[in-house]
Regions:
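Single conserved hydrophobic/aromatic residue that forms the stacking wall/gate
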Residues: 2-13
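Short, aromatic/basic amphipathic alpha-helical patches
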Residues: 109-111, 133-136
Length: 137
């Protein structure tokens, strides 16, 4: 993992806008930009990251997910989850590794915010992100 020296150097690059972590979502990039712009309190709404809900493996041994949204009328049938390149179904191990990296990005943002004296508050009910302090929605 990161040594304290590399984390410190990384923060110097981040403060100058010369580097960032491996962020996996536009939300994370938005948080980073807000911190660069000097915001000291960032509140998240609607960022649930329920990427593990509805996971299953079908009879063809493909990783699938029943992706649900608040506007759906009912449950959706699980669909295979495909990698972008190459366009093949994810394996469980690859998918979980990518999801873990996504959540690690939130920990990096939390630590970077703290180094600036800023706070990130997650106000999303049911969110799976555990890196930030919680607040009522």
């Amino acid at each position: 993992r990161d040594s304290s020296t590399s984390r410190g150097l990384g923060d110097v690059y981040k403060r100058q806008g010369l580097g960032s972590a491996n962020f996996g979502t536009v939300v994370q990039v938005g948080e980073y930009v807000a911190l660069l712009l000097g915001y000291r309190r960032i509140e998240l709404y609607g960022v649930d990251h329920t990427l593990l809900d509805g996971l299953c493996v079908d009879d063809a041994n493909r990783l699938c997910r029943a992706d649900r949204h608040y506007y759906d009328a009912g449950p959706r049938a699980p669909q295979p989850i495909y990698m972008k390149v190459p366009h093949v179904p994810y394996t469980m191990s690859v998918y979980l590794a990518e999801v873990a990296e996504l959540f690690r990005g939130h920990e990096v943002l939390r630590d970077y915010a703290a180094s600036l004296g800023a706070r990130i508050v997650n106000r999303t009910r049911g969110s799976m992100i555990d890196a930030y302090e919680r607040g009522a929605e």
